[in-house]
From Swiss-Prot:
GO cellular component: membrane
Subcellular compartments: Membrane
Role of this protein: Has a role in meiosis.
Coiled-coil region(s): none
Entry keyword set: Meiosis, Membrane, Transmembrane, Transmembrane helix
Organism encoding this protein: Schizosaccharomyces pombe (strain 972 / ATCC 24843)
Name this polypeptide is given: Meiotically up-regulated gene 45 protein
BP-aspect Gene Ontology terms: meiotic cell cycle
Domain of life: Eukaryota
Main localization (coarse): membrane
Transmembrane stretches, start-end: 797-817
Membrane topology: Single-pass membrane protein
Amino acid sequence: MKNLANIKLYWNENDFLIADMLLILKLSPRSSSDCLLDLRDRKWELVCCKELNIGNERNPLNVPLFELPVNSLELQNSVSNDMFKHVYSQNVELNHKTQVDFTEQLIPKKSLNKLNGTLRETMSRMPSFESISLSETSNALDDSCFNDDWITIESEFSPPIDRGMTLEAMDSQNDTLFTSKQLNNGPNFPVEKATFFLESNMGLSQRAAATSTTPVCNISSVTSAINSVGEISNASHSSSTSELPCTYGNTSSIFQVKNEMSNIKSAISEGYIAHDQQSKKVSVQNIKKEFLIPFEFSLEGGFLNYNKTFSNLYKVLSETEKTRDSKVWFTFRLVLKTKPLYASESEFYETKLNFFTFPLECAINFHIDCSCFDDWRLFSLKESSSVAVPIPKIKKESGRSMFQSLLFQFNHCIPFRLSWINYKQSQLNIILTETTIRPRICAAYQKLEYNILVLLNEKPSSGSQLILSASPTCTIENIYIENTRLHFSKSQTPEQTVISFIDVQCVKVTEATKTLELSVILSERLVYETALKLPVIKYVKGDNRFCFKQLLEYYDIYLKFKLLADWRLLTNPVLQIQEISDYCHFKLLKKVNRNLQIKTNYPTQEFHLLRPTIKILQISKHEYFLHFSSSYIFNDARERDVYGVKLSKNMWISWAYVDNCEANFFCKDGTYFFRTTSRKQILLLEIGILIKPERYNLFKYRVYLPQFLPPTDSRTLVEFQTIVYTNSTLLFDGSFYFSQNGGFDFEPRQNYTYFDFKSEFIILQNSYSIYGPAKNIIKLLLELIEVILNVNVSTTAMCLLTLLIGIYLILQVVFIYTN
């Protein structure tokens, strides 16, 4: 048994990101309260919290996924009758769902109603949230075949896949899916946003042996159930109520819509959507009323706590259950919202959701890309981390405190699966690709084995190519298609591996309309404390040159982890889907110091930095080379001739380019200035910087990011106070620490480190500009005045000292201009 969190992401009409969560946790009834969520950063706002009373049977929600036995795929490219088969099809009933009365059970797409403090969100009659198990195993499987930690990222618009369907039937089904007015409750609904289904398991213990049918909580009107052999079946609500840990899919039984519609007491919060039953239109309600948290929950200090003494479930528990050490299953429905603020359509939004279930702490990072591809119109979930990080327990031994190790076992973290599902099967050759990762312990070292399963619309012919994006250290163990003998050759480059099919022979005649299953098995040796690039099939080139590039061409997938060689443990794995096109977005914001009233005739020009990238190369043991490139965007096209970059004392600029032309630059007081006479609104700046970090201990270095000053007139210099980094995330192989003075410390582990971050640089800038070296005198004058104000001297003495300093300043200015 395990703790489980089902998380569903979608967007509402007001561009709020909604996280609808179902938490099934095993908590001790002896404790009075438990902390569920950490909302201290105020990025997520609580919309709804509700405890689901599902009866005495409190079995957690389990979705078994099985890994493939190694001996199931023969390594000689031959075929056996006992060959392992994969089931990708659902029952026909899912393709022909019954008619749904929208007025009684469902609300149109992306609509929200709050009923008695409970937010009820339902989807239209679309095949959403069918979490497809892509494996079939024999009944005789031990515990080692279970997959404890796995991630499924699935588009809401994925129709059910039937192996026996023809391509024409798939195409017609897709057309019906995306053009039906009854389905979308209106004219052609634009496929502009998608829902992702993320399942993460937060448990430490392994799952018990395979049981009977395990239900899946589902929002749709038909509850999907995945049995122990990986098949997907349907069960009515009446027949599966006794087995379901929660009736999450039965909206009428949980929320009692008909009874509660007449007892609406709490209004809809600001920015949410109400539904007009008569006109069937969605309208925005701007009623400003706070959400009333139920008595069994409390929001204190940014933490959402669950108070058992106020819950209905706690009241029905017997006194024996309340006092004993055994835990009881609790089920919660939590709905959160956040407002991603994009400065442009190419910006990223990143947020984190923290769960607390002692002794586990689980953090899920969402990195959402706002850009859309050609016809996908798809918001992509770029980064997800579903790893439960154990909080160490402290125990006393021999009079001293010791930390008890609660690290994950090797097979607790992996294998897991990452699935990409395409909803336009008839247009692309690749329907689905799935990667299963599992450890293999050899005599002298450890390695990871990747099993990539691909669903194809057509069989590869002789001369076809399969392009695999993988690390050069990956070794191809086997390529297999059921009932087919393959002869292939490969050519490998640092970026990709090209597999050319020489001869494709069909051993057993099969129906040409069935989808084909291609298996590619690779292995890679583990290296201590490194980041491995996960292999991904990006193209299958044939006569029609179909590809899956809309989803996979722009991404490299990495598995970051630390390998403890002594204990053979895999800790803190993070799945990252990282974009290949090196761009991110941040902007420079000016905050004027209102205390200074000095005027100037040369104001600075507002600008933005677009798509800045920073790459760091280690050229020697204690020297680094930083390559920075970015685009300056201005409000107008006036002539600009000076750009300033302020560097720390241990950094030097070696070369600079402006608009792909070598630029002249000069240094003054640690600030480098570049001259240009261009009148463009967008200028590209590239600089190369040599760095010799300050080594302040044995392992870590200190490096300061360059400060980019606004472009000014050649006669104007701007005095900056400090630079502040907010909402910054740096992804690289190593640990980093921000310091208070704007720098960051990092520990390099590789010769090449890539910094991919989305930051908002806030420059605290004074509202005055000063001529030439007089700025230093003004700065000194202000410092002296500040010192004088802190000393107990008479007013006369302070005035005399200020007068003397003013006379000295005037003489210095006259001397400068006369020379």
